[in-house]
Amino acid sequence: DRVTLEVFRGCIRGCRFCQAGFICRPVREKSPEVLCRQAKESVDATGYDEISMCCLSISDYSHIASFTDGLLGWTDDARVNISLPSMRADSFTRELMDKISSVRTSTLTFAPEAGSPRLRDVINKNITEEEIMRACGITFAAGKNQVKLYFMNGLPHETDEDIAGIAELAEHVIDKYYATPEANKKRRPQVTISVACFIPKPHTPFEREPQALPEVLLEKQQFLSSCIHDRKIRYNYHDVDVSRIEAVFARGDRRLGAAILEAVKCGAVFDAWTEFFDYNRWLEIFEKCGLDPAFYANRTIPDDEILPWDVIDCGVSKDFLIRERHKAAEAIATPSCKDKCSACGANSLAPNKACRWCPGGDAGDDSVPHIVPEPGEMSASAPKPDVSERPIRTVRLRFAKKGALAYIGHLDLVNALSRVMIRSGLPV
């Protein structure tokens, strides 16, 4: 129930577990003018009061300042909430925090992904604990008392020390809150750590790495839980059985088509909902089709084995993925595309050098004019008229719920009426 606005596509970072970061290369950004127009038109057309920014890292958008200035021209008065994706801690600045604090935002999210510097080098998450603490300090200084941290367990080359480091990092964030002079000490801090299970994905350097068995993943989750001793830390984790089924289909081949058909016949059609998911039923389906889940999810695939998805060319070369896999085993990080081209091959997708950071590529024009709100839009810095001076008219509406709509719930009805008012453009 929100507007989804794609800010840009692709990523310059190269996290070795992230499929979207590789298959969506090279980076392509929308201009701030296009984004602001699409956001306004979408809210006017749908009546939604929330805009969700869709991208891999909003703080990596090269024109974030101009974009947020354009949004501030109308979202504040329209009471439109801005939902932000996870931030890169190393590119999060006080200037960006000041801008997003001017609009109604949800809890800020950062994604360290691993609890130790060594494992972050393994997965190529090029951020340090100092950068994470600095980003959290900026958040707390702006009056926020909550942050979310995303992690993964079961990563390749992971140890118990890496898992315990997740709890230690969360505790350091709590300490950072109390060490920040500008923080609002009247409210208790809260750090939410959300830990997902590693799932090997095609077209990533970790596509050949195994997923840990469900019982091993469960042990890792329980171990992390035992390391958390502060009630100000909230721990969320994913279902290991669901993650294993996801891993089976992530690295599956055409033989899984028979399993999907059999699953539909067995009634497994709403398994995205936890109450309908039945892990044992899936095991029975695989057995009936003569398939071994461990073959797909839990084995290491040699470098010379042909993969089912090798017929798909996403632009990133197979040799590059294998090189990155070997660098991960030695905990060697690869710099971002902005710092140094790693010759991934994505630049071959377009004859005019689509990758802006590749040698000889078209870097484009980074100069973007400041966006001025259209006439009639409220500027974020402009003085707002006194509401008491506006003429007030009372309008009474009578309506009835008929037909199938007679069964609509009360909350859904209230939300529908609210969206109708927004779409009408009435100054309510």
Roles of regions detected by a PLM:
Residues 62-63, 92-96, 118-123, 153-161, ...:
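Flexible glycine/acidic-rich beta-alpha junction loops that bind and position SAM and/or redox cofactors
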Residues 29, 160, 211, 404-412:
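Ordered, soluble secondary-structure elements with a strong preference for glycine-centered loop motifs
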Residues 40-192, 196, 200:
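Conserved SAM/AdoMet-binding glycine-rich loop
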Residues 410-428:
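Glycine/small-residue-rich interface belts in oligomeric ring/scaffold proteins
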Residues 229-384:
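Radical SAM enzyme core and accessory elements
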